[in-house]
Amino acid sequence: MERHIRYDAASRSLILLDQRYLPTREEDFVCRNTDDIVTALQVMVVRGAPAIGVTAAWGCVLAAYETAESGMETWRPVLDGLIERIANARPTAVNLRWAVERMRAAWHSLGRADLATLITYWTNEAKRIHRDDIAINRRMGEHGAELIDDGDAVMTHCNAGALATAGYGTALGVIRGAVEAGKNITVIANETRPFLQGARLTAFELHEDGIPVTVACDNACGLLMKRGMVQKVVVGADRIAANGDAANKIGTYSVALLAREHGIPFYVAAPLSTIDRETPDGDHIPIENRTPTEVTHVGATQITPDGVPVFNFAFDVTPAHLIAGIVTEMGVLRAPYRESIAEAFRKAGL
């Protein structure tokens, strides 16, 4: 599944599969300018840290075209402001800022080049980011597959699959890698309230691929583990701190605690671009607080009384000591994570 992020050069637009409507309807959301990109990111037309990064890279290309169409001679500060808007669209997923800063660095490497030259260069850079993400996910899948045994039931939370990346997936990349290695496994997809990424998106992806998947209520995790129905847990991440603390979709921390209680290995799968070496630990990761209507309503139906406040934190942080390993394109990192993360970046030349 790699059709969900598509750049159309002829129309100078980014075409996104609108994930808000899956699995019952497949509808495209077309981005033609910065406003469209920011909206797509904020309302979660596209979500998942790597996919957010790829979208941001293409968003920079659209911002450059938008700047060119304005005809302003002093275009550099205008363009810089547009791409900064993209970088600030969502606070937790570090790949968003990473992608924009990579595009900005490419811009600076050109010196005083004109806007037409920058557009060409940025288009090629966005293609590289897009292509590289798929290749990185496949490498992670190969490394992570070694952690999965034949016959395992693997639990996952939220959606860290092809839809959350440029293709193949991080946590689901590990699952796909295990299946491609000939292992007979099943998947338990937690529904993942309130946006239901597990029930809607993970189940959709795996069912399309013919990988056995069962959706579970979030609050059934403990029972399933106690009954021996879960052998491994693999999740993605939106930001990993330098010490290995990992921010992922709200509820992940609870799953990790339950896994520790029941002696079940809990793994995080994420590319090096999701690791923020400038963030020392999880206490310094910003946690997005989203609109209350995601909790108070299911679709158009209100389920809570008027006037009752809600908590809608989009992410929580799983401390490093609960994580058995972090699957990256450089291999599976083990504790102590501060050292293994630093070594992985050294090996990658970053």
Curated annotation (Swiss-Prot):
The keyword 4Fe-4S does not apply. The record marks C158 as: Transition state stabilizer. It holds the Pfam family IF-2B. GO terms for molecular function: S-methyl-5-thioribose-1-phosphate isomerase activity. Pathway: Amino-acid biosynthesis; L-methionine biosynthesis via salvage pathway; L-methionine from S-methyl-5-thio-alpha-D-ribose 1-phosphate: step 1/6. Signal peptide: none annotated. It comes from Nitratidesulfovibrio vulgaris (strain ATCC 29579 / DSM 644 / CCUG 34227 / NCIMB 8303 / VKM B-1760 / Hildenborough). Substrate binds at R47, G48, A49, R90, Q197, N248, K249. The active site is at D238 (proton donor). This is Methylthioribose-1-phosphate isomerase. GO terms for biological process: L-methionine salvage from methylthioadenosine. Catalyzes the interconversion of methylthioribose-1-phosphate (MTR-1-P) into methylthioribulose-1-phosphate (MTRu-1-P). It comes from the Bacteria. HAMAP family: Salvage_MtnA. It catalyses: 5-(methylsulfanyl)-alpha-D-ribose 1-phosphate = 5-(methylsulfanyl)-D-ribulose 1-phosphate. The keyword Protein biosynthesis does not apply. Keywords: Amino-acid biosynthesis, Isomerase, Methionine biosynthesis. Gene3D superfamilies: translation initiation factor eif-2b, domain 1, Translation initiation factor eif-2b, domain 2. Belongs to the eIF-2B alpha/beta/delta subunits family. MtnA subfamily. Its EC number is 5.3.1.23.
